[in-house]
Amino acid sequence: MKFSRFVSILVLFGLLTKVQGPSLTDFLFPRRCPRFREECEHRERDLCTRDRDCQKREKCCIFSCGKKCLNPQQDICSLPKDSGYCMAYFPRWWYNKKNGTCQLFIYGGCQGNNNNFQSQSICQNACEKKSNST
């Protein structure tokens, strides 16, 4: 009798955490933001202020000159080049994993992804050193 109550409470707890908050593995193995700090040409607008501003598997991290929502389990340097859908003209750098170099592209100013750096040196420090160590 006591055991079945205990199991029912565990099942209910498991269902509620999936609906209302982080999963049990997030408590046991907390995710961390990348430890990447760089001198920036200019500070970018923060896209978040805390983890609650981000989607389920993302954290609000200081990354590439501003606060951004990142999935700590995702390799940012593996993301494809994404100019976004706006029509601004911002020269930026992205890491091309196929040839292992940072390449210039034009960012439209909104959306896109986090494989988007202000300078070639910031891109290299974030991605090339990481890929050389693996």
From Swiss-Prot:
Region (Interaction with SEMG1): 102-133
Gene3D superfamilies on file: Elafin-like, Pancreatic trypsin inhibitor Kunitz domain
GO CC terms in record: acrosomal vesicle; cell surface; cytoplasm; extracellular space; protein-containing complex
A GO BP annotation: negative regulation of flagellated sperm motility
PROSITE patterns: BPTI_KUNITZ_1, BPTI_KUNITZ_2, WAP
Annotated disulfide bonds: 33-61, 40-65, 48-60, 54-69, 77-127, 86-110, 102-123
Ranges for domain BPTI/Kunitz inhibitor: 77-127
The UniProt record lists the keyword Transferase: no
Pfam families noted in UniProt: Kunitz_BPTI, WAP
Entry annotated with the keyword Zinc-finger: no
Domain WAP: start-end pairs: 26-73
Signal sequence, start to end: 1-21
GO terms for MF: serine-type endopeptidase inhibitor activity
UniProt-annotated location(s): Secreted
Keywords tagged on the record: Antimicrobial, Disulfide bond, Protease inhibitor, Repeat, Secreted, Serine protease inhibitor, Signal
Main localization (coarse): secreted
Region span, Interaction with LTF: 117-133
Domain of life per record: Eukaryota
InterPro entries, per the entry: Elafin-like_sf, Kunitz_BPTI, Kunitz_BPTI_sf, Prtase_inh_Kunz-CS, Serpin_venom_toxin, WAP_dom
SUBUNIT field: Monomer. Homodimer. Homomultimers. Interacts with SEMG1 (via 164-283 AA). Interacts with LTF. Found in a complex with LTF, CLU, EPPIN and SEMG1.
PANTHER family in the cross-refs: EPPIN
Role: Serine protease inhibitor that plays an essential role in male reproduction and fertility. Modulates the hydrolysis of SEMG1 by KLK3/PSA (a serine protease), provides antimicrobial protection for spermatozoa in the ejaculate coagulum, and binds SEMG1 thereby inhibiting sperm motility.
Protein name: Eppin
Source species of the chain: Rattus norvegicus
Lineage: Eukaryota, Metazoa, Chordata, Craniata, Vertebrata
